Structure formats: C-alpha cells, structure tokens
Amino acid sequence: MVVNILVVNPNSSKSMTISLQETIEKTISKESCEISYFTGPNTSPPQIDGQETSVQSMKACLPVLTDDKGSIYYFQKFDGILIACFSDHPLVTELKDVAAKEKSNVSVVGLLDSSIQYCNLVGRNFSIITSNKEWIPILNASVQSKFLTGNTIDKNLWKGTVSTDLQVLALHSPDNFQQIADIIRDENLRKLDSEIVILGCAGFSGLQNKLAKKFEKEGTLFLDTIEVGLEILITMIKFVRSQK
C-alpha cells in the first residue's frame, strides 16, 4: 500500500521546496510513496537562521497544518510528515503534541532528530556541517541535551558542528562547492576525525553524491538528512500500519 507523506519546508522560499522535491524524486520510488510538498506562508521567514526565525516559522505554519480540516495540507490527511529543516524545530514537537491530543496515528519527524538517531545506531565518529555560524551553539546544545545515547557519549562519537559561514540559500550554488569541500576536509575530517558528516541544512540537499565522490579515497559517509529522514519516517508509518 502506498504511504502518503507531506514534506514541510517551514520557510517561505519556494526555490528551496523545488530543490527538495527534485532531490526526493531522484531517491524515493513513486510506486511506494505519494509525496506532497508544503512551503511556509508569507508570514514565515525566507530562511531559518536561528532560534528566532525557527519560532516565527512554527507560528506561521502550525495553523495552516492543524486548524483547517478542509485544507489539502491538514495534517491528518497524511500518514507521515517530515519537517525539512535541520534544527530542533519547534514545529516537530508542536505537531506531535496536536497529533497526540487528537489521537492521530500520523508520524512526525525532523531532520535533526532522525539523522542523529541514525548515527547513534551506526556507532562511528560523526559531526555536522551547517550554514552560518549562529547555528553552531544552537545545534551543539540541541544534540547534546536531547539526542545522544549513552553509548555515543561514552565512546565520544559525537564531534561537534562546523560552519561553512554561508547563508542557507547560498549552499546550493555551484560557485560555493569547493569552499564547502575545503572546510569539510580541514575541519570535519582532519580536525574532528569524523567518519560520518551530516549535511546539516536542507540547503545541502542533493550534494551527498557529489561530496561522496570528492572524498572517495577518505571513505567518508555523507548523510543527506532529507533521505535519512524520509526513510525513517516510511519505516515508522509501515510499523504503525502493521498494528492495524
């Protein structure tokens, strides 16, 4: 049976949604998933670059997803929802809370929680590469306070966050690829000794294979958080369905 998923871009940049869709259509079979896409309304910021814009986007998106039962984006019309922002985005928790109150079986995941849990299971050194520097303390605090397992902490597998010092919308520009690759080599690999590098922003979507090829000799695993998030979400949906 086909699963019905909503991918939520919580900012108001339609170009980011288009980029997400292009990446997803290359990796996820249409035969197994029916995927719809939501872009934040005009009251949502054009890009999310910290805690303030995260909260702003949550307040803009949540009513659209939960208040109007006739809307094509009403959350209960989907089996699962992926919040496509790499942060401890408050929309993830808020949607889960609404679903729990209404006793809905919809599964909700974000990019940060799903990718960190994947790394916890793999059990190898990992770090994050992100956009602007403001994200470093935010992501480090979120990961360390909420998402690490005891085993990951005991083995010191979590190595921290590195910034490209680029804004979200600039990450996808071909002109910046070499700069991003140089930072990964110097900081994530040499300095932090990472075996897995999480591409910690939706703006990196689609760069996984290009970076893997660039660092083929090093054997680095690059984690496309959209792909990992979707695969985990699909597994959750199938498990819920198996109980019926």
Where are these regions (language model features)?
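Active-site rim beta-loop-alpha module in soluble metabolic enzymes
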Residues: 130-202
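N-terminal glycine-rich phosphate/adenylate-binding segment common to multiple enzyme folds
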Residues: 56-99, 109-112, 195-208
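Short, acidic/small-residue loops that bind anionic groups at enzyme active sites
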Residues: 95-122, 214-233
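Short, hydrophobic alpha-helical segments
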Residues: 122, 188, 230-242
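Short hydrophobic segments within beta-strands
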Residues: 8-10, 38, 128-131
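Eukaryotic N-terminal targeting leaders
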Residues: 1-3, 241-244
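N-terminal beta1-alpha1 ligand-phosphate binding loop
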Residues: 3-28
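N-terminal beta-loop-helix "entrance" segment that forms/cooperates
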Residues: 37-63, 168-174
